[in-house]
Each structure stands twice: as structure tokens, then as C-alpha cells.
């Protein structure tokens, strides 16, 4: 089986572990995009601590789960999102207003849609978490 997306596989593993009630999950392979995505999730309290383990290959990440996550996923292909269109994407992807985050990759780094609106930057849509 070929991997379609490393980020999609990682978020799928987190979703499955959260649904089965696990306290932690091992993600491999690792990438910088996964680490930044996890940092945004951690900042908003959807996951606990996570630790990067360098195994001199592609690396592993051990994520501590805290039971707050309902769902996270990847948007593929990574559509370009203008600042004015962010509101439409949040309405389409998230279950309610003021609930969950759409995560974008911008020229200023990977961030959630609220931070992107504050910094007045647009970019490509990576995924969502709620």
C-alpha cells in the first residue's frame, strides 16, 4: 500500500487512537509539517505533550492524548485560500461557529484560521481540527 500523505496517515492514527480510548499514539514517519500541525493542536488543548524520537531514519513522534479531540483531518488538494474566503471554509469544514480550527500553511508559518486573520495572511489549507 502506498502512502498518499504522511500528514493524513498521522492524523488518521490520532483519530483512531482517540476513538478507541488510548492515552498515547505512535506516529511514524515524522515530518516538519506534522510537528507544526501538532503544535497548533497542542496550543488549543486538543492533545497533550508530544515527543519527537530520532531513530536515524524518518523519526517517530509519541503523542499523549487527553480525550478532547472529536475529529481532525486533512484537506486534499491543498486549496489556496484568500483572507476573505477563510470564513467560507470554516463554515464548510467545522460543525459550528466558534468551535474548532481550520489550519493553514502561510508564508508566516503553519497556523489556525483565527491567527491568520489577525496577521492578515492567506495561504493554502492543510486541514481541520475540532
Curated annotation (Swiss-Prot):
It holds the Pfam family Ribosomal_S8. It is found in: Cytoplasm. One of its GO terms (biological process) is cytoplasmic translation. InterPro entries: Ribosomal_uS8, Ribosomal_uS8_CS, Ribosomal_uS8_sf. The keyword Glycosyltransferase does not apply. GO terms for cellular component: cytosol; cytosolic small ribosomal subunit. Its main location: cytoplasm. Belongs to the universal ribosomal protein uS8 family. Component of the small ribosomal subunit (SSU). Mature yeast ribosomes consist of a small (40S) and a large (60S) subunit. The 40S small subunit contains 1 molecule of ribosomal RNA (18S rRNA) and 33 different proteins (encoded by 57 genes). The large 60S subunit contains 3 rRNA molecules (25S, 5.8S and 5S rRNA) and 46 different proteins (encoded by 81 genes). Component of the ribosome, a large ribonucleoprotein complex responsible for the synthesis of proteins in the cell. The small ribosomal subunit (SSU) binds messenger RNAs (mRNAs) and translates the encoded message by selecting cognate aminoacyl-transfer RNA (tRNA) molecules. The large subunit (LSU) contains the ribosomal catalytic site termed the peptidyl transferase center (PTC), which catalyzes the formation of peptide bonds, thereby polymerizing the amino acids delivered by tRNAs into a polypeptide chain. This is Small ribosomal subunit protein uS8A. It comes from Saccharomyces cerevisiae (strain ATCC 204508 / S288c). The gene is RPS22A.
Amino acid at each position: 500500500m502506498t502512502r498518499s500523505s504522511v500528514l493524513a496517515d498521522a492524523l488518521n492514527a490520532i483519530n483512531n487512537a482517540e476513538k478507541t480510548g488510548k492515552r498515547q499514539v505512535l506516529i511514524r514517519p515524522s515530518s516538519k509539517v506534522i510537528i507544526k500541525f501538532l503544535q497548533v493542536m497542542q496550543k488549543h488543548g486538543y492533545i497533550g505533550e508530544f515527543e519527537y524520537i530520532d531513530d536515524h531514519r524518518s523519526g517517530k513522534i509519541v503523542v499523549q492524548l487527553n480525550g478532547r479531540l472529536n475529529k481532525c483531518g486533512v484537506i486534499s488538494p491543498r486549496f489556496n485560500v484568500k483572507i476573505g474566503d477563510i470564513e467560507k471554509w470554516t463554515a464548510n469544514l467545522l460543525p459550528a461557529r466558534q468551535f474548532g480550527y481550520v489550519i493553514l500553511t502561510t508564508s508566516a508559518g503553519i497556523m489556525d484560521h483565527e491567527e491568520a486573520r489577525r496577521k492578515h495572511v492567506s495561504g493554502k489549507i492543510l486541514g481541520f481540527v475540532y
